[in-house]
């Protein structure tokens, strides 16, 4: 039931949003790109991590709030598919990310690169959408 509600909310919010959408998350896991296997398969253990993502009604700004910081991301482009919504974003400090709302797996995913150029994927498990 929760997944159906989540799908309905994300579908509506990606096309005809009339209010901000909030997504609370319960855990976080980071995986690194393995050049040999060509997969994100070098992963940390999932850790308990309460955080919230808030997309404004125009879908041009995403805010991520944790217990110790708030980051703002400005949307530069977006694409919608049946089970995915993808945003290209730039953070308030100039870092570029690809953000995926993975409807089927109930995940928010941030893909970026570290200072050495290594690609990582941080996945947040969704607790609630409102």
Language-model features: locations:
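N-terminal secretory signal peptides
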Residues: 20-67
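Hydrophobic/aromatic beta-strand elements that line small-molecule binding cavities or substrate pockets
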Residues: 49-55, 75-77, 96-101, 123-127
């Amino acid at each position: 039931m929760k997944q159906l509600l989540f799908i309905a909310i994300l579908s509506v919010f990606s096309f005809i949003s009339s209010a901000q959408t909030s997504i609370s998350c319960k855990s976080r896991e980071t995986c690194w790109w393995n050049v040999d296997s060509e997969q994100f398969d070098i992963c940390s253990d999932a850790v308990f991590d309460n955080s919230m993502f808030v997309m404004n009604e125009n879908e041009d700004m995403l805010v991520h709030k944790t217990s110790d910081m708030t980051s703002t991301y400005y949307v530069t482009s977006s694409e919608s598919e049946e089970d995915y919504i993808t945003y290209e974003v730039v953070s308030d400090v100039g870092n570029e990310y690809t953000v995926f709302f993975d409807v089927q797996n109930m995940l928010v995913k941030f893909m970026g690169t570290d200072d050495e150029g290594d690609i990582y994927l941080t996945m947040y498990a969704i607790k609630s959408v409102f």
